[in-house]
């Protein structure tokens, strides 16, 4: 399982969401609305002698903070478990990421803020577990 292939696969899945800018590498200054695919943390050899590895990573979804209400409403549509704007549904639309892994699962989404330079965004941090 190569990190670059996993990131590229996640980017392709997330690009199915209309209007979403997707970064497979952490940008200096993102343009919202955006999904940023983070770096992978690996656990090797879960199943004897190179049989299975596990990677965990975050995808941060952020929106511009125009006002609290409008920013939160924009962000909430991405949190839905299904539908055209669902981050979870988009990520899990191809569980093998075009062969980059065996399977994956979105395990959680945590609300927060994301800062880049002088700009603060509203965000959700999606935790993903990938096996391969």
Locations of the language-model features?
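Two-metal-ion RNase H-like nuclease active-site motif
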Residues: 37
């Amino acid at each position: 399982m190569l990190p670059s292939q996993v990131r590229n696969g996640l980017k392709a899945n997330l690009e199915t969401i209309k209007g979403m800018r997707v970064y497979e590498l952490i940008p200096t200054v993102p343009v919202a609305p955006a999904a940023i695919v983070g770096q992978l943390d690996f656990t090797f050899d879960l199943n004897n002698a190179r049989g299975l590895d596990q990677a965990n990573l975050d995808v941060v979804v952020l929106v511009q903070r125009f006002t609290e209400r409008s920013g939160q409403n924009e962000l909430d549509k991405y949190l839905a478990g299904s539908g055209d704007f669902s981050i979870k549904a988009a990520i899990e639309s191809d569980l093998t990421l075009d062969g980059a892994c065996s399977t994956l699962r979105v395990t959680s989404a945590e609300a927060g803020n994301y800062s880049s330079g002088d700009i603060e965004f509203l965000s959700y941090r999606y935790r993903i577990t990938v096996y391969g």
